[in-house]
Amino acid sequence: MGGISIWQLLIIALIVVLLFGTKKLRSLGGDLGGAVKGFKNAMSSEEEKKALEDSAAEKKAESTDTAEKKAESKDKEQA
């Protein structure tokens, strides 16, 4: 009883269509869809950038570890 029924939603939708017209609603929907798509693209490129930075940091750490191991093995060979 306290909730909004389907009939009430249909009446509201009909009033909105009558007030704004279908062309205006279509353009608003397209603009909203474009904004959502742009936001998703921005978020995915940000995540890709972070992933690249993480992988670069891991590679740097691995190369540092490898260099340290080589230095230790040379020290052992000299001793």
UniProtKB/Swiss-Prot annotation:
Annotated stretches, region: Disordered: 47-79
InterPro entries found in the cross-reference section: TatA/B/E, TatA/E
Record carries keyword Cell membrane: yes
Protein keywords: Cell inner membrane, Cell membrane, Membrane, Protein transport, Translocation, Transmembrane, Transmembrane helix, Transport
Single biological process term from Gene Ontology: protein transport by the Tat complex
Keyword Nucleus: no
Assembly and oligomerization: The Tat system comprises two distinct complexes: a TatABC complex, containing multiple copies of TatA, TatB and TatC subunits, and a separate TatA complex, containing only TatA subunits. Substrates initially bind to the TatABC complex, which probably triggers association of the separate TatA complex to form the active translocon.
Protein name: Sec-independent protein translocase protein TatA
Source organism of this protein record: Shewanella piezotolerans (strain WP3 / JCM 13877)
